[in-house]
A protein has these predicted regions:
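Intrinsically disordered, low-complexity terminal regions
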Residues: 1-47, 82-130
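A detector of tandem-repeat and repeat-rich interaction/domain scaffolds
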Residues: 43-95
Length: 130
């Protein structure tokens, strides 16, 4: 099920006061894909199975840590990244970027002097422009 929202007011019915988060469920089923057609700025933790976006940065999603199964994006800008699979065009991180299975990108850069990026199982692929 896909659900699109055009304003913050439209998502209010999904707010769960007890957990202080939004739970996107209808008819006892989670909504598979939630699409926001407006700027969304939140001061919260983002726990997700997949984040699919054109860009993840301080203008779109600001987080000290991004922890998800898959990140698929053109550009990622974050402090730390912890994921199963990362597929991106450019990755810029502060101190640490790692994936359990793979990282595939055009560029990957740590902004701290001794920043590290690595993959536990699988490989890191930095594709060169042809």
């Amino acid at each position: 099920m896909v659900k699109e929202f055009n304003s913050l007011e439209e998502i209010q019915k999904y707010y769960d006061k007890e957990s202080n988060t939004y739970v996107f469920r209808e008819n006892d089923r989670y909504i598979d894909l939630v699409k926001f057609n407006f700027d969304l700025n939140v001061n919260a933790n983002i726990d997700a199975r997949d984040i699919i976006a054109w860009s993840i940065n301080t203008h779109d999603i600001y987080a000290y840590d991004i922890k998800v199964d898959d990140i698929i994006a053109n550009d990622i800008y974050a402090n730390n990244i912890n994921a199963i699979v990362i597929k991106a065009y450019d990755i810029s991180y502060y101190a640490l970027c790692f994936a359990y299975c793979s990282i595939k990108c055009k560029s990957i850069t740590g902004r701290r002097k001794d920043a590290k990026h690595f993959v536990f199982d699988g490989k890191l692929e930095v594709e060169q422009d042809e």
